[in-house]
Amino acid sequence: MEVIRIFNKVAERLDKEAAIRIFVLAHQLERDKLIRLLQGLLWRLRFRKPKSKDCLCWFCCRLYYWQLQSTLSIDTA
């Protein structure tokens, strides 16, 4: 739960592509390393204003990632 909360805070300051990349990376890293990465990003982006164009919460990034996967599988088929 802590990971999702920190991810949401970081993602609101990123563009859509960067948020999806962090989402994918989140599934490849150990929990402790991911939390340290997200806290570092949150510190680095602390003065950047939130971008409100797209919702980039954990669940929306999951949806965007699934859409991207289905698009890529259709294109390669």
From Swiss-Prot:
One GO CC term on file: virion component
Principal location listed in the UniProt entry: virion
InterPro entries attached to this UniProt entry: FIV_OrfA
UniProt key word NAD: no
Compartment annotation: Virion; Host nucleus
Positions occupied by motif Nuclear localization signal: 44-53
UniProt keyword terms in alphabetical order: Host nucleus, Virion
Motif, Nuclear export signal: chain positions: 34-42
Lipoprotein in keyword set: no
Its job: Seems to function as a Vpr-like protein, since it mediates host cell cycle arrest in G2 phase. Cell cycle arrest creates a favorable environment for maximizing viral expression and production.
Protein name per its UniProtKB record: Probable Vpr-like protein
Source organism (scientific name): Feline immunodeficiency virus (strain San Diego) (FIV)
